[in-house]
Amino acid sequence: RLMVGVLIPREEWIWGDLAHQKVLIEALRKRDLNVIPVFSHWAADPIQHSTGVDTAIENYFRDKTGWRIDVLVNTLKFSLTVGRPVNIEFFQTMDRPILQAYNLLQDEASWRANPEGMTPLDLSFSISLPEFDGVIHSVPYAYKEDRGANDIRHLPLAERAGFLARKAEKWAILRRKP
């Protein structure tokens, strides 16, 4: 079976903000894909005893025989390499498609009402900066809901998560073609 790695911000696990990630993982599994979700901090932080994305990818998506995944879905906002102590050549040596999942910084109603769709901030964080990593673009799969009192949650756009899952499957199939 095809294997999909999903890179998830460690902070979302700490804050219990996982509804959108659960819907994405369910959408991938509905397509009969094996999924390895991995929580990671974007850069190594010795104070918090956390590794960076490159170490997390190496530890969980690779074994002694090689890469375990056919495609990587990155749900971390921003670039994986720009302004971070991460070696961009590491991602090139993976030789795996990396899909950038868009987590909107606006609520669903604003996004749907906006004829331009994504805001300049969304475009910068989700599209422009990740382009430096050589990622493949996908679709918004989640939006931000501000519940007040510093309670911000990210909620799923279920139909978009399904589209993202289908795109991941197609890229995984394409990667295996001789």
Describe the function of each predicted region.
Residues 1-178:
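An N-terminal assembly and electron-transfer interface module characteristic of large anaerobic redox
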